[in-house]
Curated annotation (Swiss-Prot):
It is found in: Cell membrane. It is a peripheral membrane protein. This is A-type ATP synthase subunit F. The keyword Cytoplasm does not apply. It comes from Methanococcus maripaludis (strain DSM 14266 / JCM 13030 / NBRC 101832 / S2 / LL). Belongs to the V-ATPase F subunit family. Keywords: ATP synthesis, Cell membrane, Hydrogen ion transport, Ion transport, Membrane, Transport.
Length: 99
């Protein structure tokens, strides 16, 4: 299994330094959606990493694929959300509210 990355130049540079080769540097939501589609069509890719800000802009493209997509903060830090998506998933799956 390989890991694919879709991100801005700073994020992509970090993952390239870590040795990942399936990386897409994008500058627009359209480029990001196309990169996600290309990574999704590659059977060797099992995990796709992108930034939270890109993820918000291409939510429909991410929701339509079957691979695991992990959203990480970019250089501006994490996006503050009213509901933490991980807490919501745990609460729905287990019935326990994490504080």
């Amino acid at each position: 299994m390989r890991i694919g990355v879709v991100g801005d130049p700073d994020v992509v540079a970090g993952f390239r330094l870590a040795g990942l080769t399936d990386v897409y540097e994008v500058n627009s939501p359209e480029q990001a959606a196309k990169a996600i589609e290309e990574l999704n069509s590659n059977s060797e890719i099992g995990l796709i990493i992108t930034t939270e800000r890109i993820g918000e802009k291409i939510r429909d493209a991410i929701s339509s694929i079957k691979k695991v997509v992990v959203e990480v903060p970019d250089k501006n830090g994490p996006i503050v959300r009213e509901n933490d998506p991980v807490k919501v998933l745990v609460r729905n799956a287990v019935g326990v509210d994490i504080k």
